[in-house]
Amino acid sequence: LAVGWRMTFAVVGALSAAAVVYQATVFPAMPAGERFTFKQLPELLKNPLLIALYAVTVFMATGYYASYSYIEPFLAQVAHVDASAITMTLTAFGCSGLLGSWLFGRLFDGHRFPFLAITLSGVPVALLLMGPAASSLVTVLAVCALWGCCATAFNVAFQAELIKHTPADSSAVAMSIFSGLFNLGIGTGTAIGGAVVSGPGIAWIGYAGGAIAVVGVILAITVMFPAIRRAKPVA
């Protein structure tokens, strides 16, 4: 908003190029493992933990993007935030994601299930609070910070679980499926959010997204967590 979309894309492109150069020069070359064949896919999809994790991912991503896709007009029309404050809010949202990644590194190994439960639950809590928080910029910032932190933290934690519970020759494919389903959630959530905006109104996107994410949390607690406890790490 502050510098325009062209400059935004230019900055993102420059940062992405810098990240590629950094990875190419700093990280060591990794030997290629065994090739994954199409015949291994049915076996991968028989893993109950992966299926549960994938299902939770779809619901969480759908709920997230039912709201996030329309956060800018929500802030402008419902929270009555001006352009500079919207930029500040979205920046705080992004920075809170960095906090979520840091918390993952510090806490996940020693507090696995509490970490997953808290970060997963934080997403629908934040979404459901969007409407009530819209009366004040301070509360909007707090809700967006909670939202961004928890969303990033559970996303990274899910990827760690995928790597831990899939063979080395299958982990890349398992991760690709995860990414594909997350993108499915993005598209589905955006469509649902658009229907909410066209119907009840943009003030309701947080409630719609939160309700969907609650389903994801319930699935995680009742299906995914027991599957994780039963599974034996293979990586």
Enumerate the predicted regions with their spans.
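Extracytoplasmic gate region of multi-pass secondary transporters
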Residues: L49-T91, C95-L98, R112
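A membrane-interface helix-boundary motif in multi-pass transporters
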Residues: L1-G13, A195-V214
